[in-house]
From Swiss-Prot:
Entry GO MF terms: acetylglutamate kinase activity; ATP binding
Gene: argB
Origin: domain of life: Bacteria
Listed name of the protein: Acetylglutamate kinase
Main location: cytoplasm
Keyword Translocase included in the entry's annotation: no
Record-level GO BP terms: arginine biosynthetic process via ornithine; L-arginine biosynthetic process
Amino acid sequence: MSIEHTSHDPSKPDPAKARTLAAALPWLKRYHGKIVVVKYGGNAMTDETLKRAFAEDIAFLRFAGFKPVVVHGGGPQISTMLDRLGIRSEFRGGLRVTTPEAMDVVRMVLVGQVQRELVGLINEHGPLAVGCSGEDAGLFTAEPANTVIDGEEVDLGLVGEVARVRPESVLDLIEAGRIPVVSSVAPDADGQVHNVNADSAAAALAVALGAEKLLVLTDVEGLYLDWPSSDDVIGEISPEALEEILPTLASGMVPKMGACLQAVRNGVPRATVVDGREPHAVLLELFTNEGVGTQVLPGVETKTRKARDTQS
């Protein structure tokens, strides 16, 4: 009896993969069984590859023993639907005014489109994700946002901030082994639904849940030390140092860094803005020493690095 040998050699074990997995051990130990709140937004919401990578990351966290919670907005999708329906947008100080007519669209898009798509992508990896909004079980109570532009208060209509969080419904989902996916709409004390800022909503929820970490996805590498004069990106910064420079930041970074500051000031141990343009950015941030963003962490000296795009 002869044994036929194929010309194809079996793949050899890859020690590099083993080292990568072993390097994740400290982070697995730190976050195992802990709640991590992730604010989903930016390019990760519009690029098909990044959408799927994000959903894989969130499912991975759940199977690795983390307790992920996702909060999302949907600015680009809202704008697209308003244009499609022929609803004219009014802007004040560069910010959209949310009229009652526009609010109906906001609610429809966030709860009925963005949330459903993300829940579906996560659930390709198992029956994990459950969608909800700030309206469900009284999760969020909103109040009108106090928006000041160039020293003057501006009325943006039905735009709100989270005034109160009742986290019990989300905690019930977490206890059942589910991944809550939360849309950032919420009623005020009179029942009028508002479009709430998803960054600050994620921070408020992270505080109420006693989360171990808040991640906020964005479309830049992190917080630049002196943009556009410098290509130095801040890797770590203390709440005190961030509070000092917050008024000088570009308008797009203020709500994101403000959310991180809000979370850490109110008991979340660490909060990070993450470069959501990077596939699997959530895993890279949580499981590597370098991370892919700017972390707000009490008691640290400000640390910087060169932006990746400028490195040779």
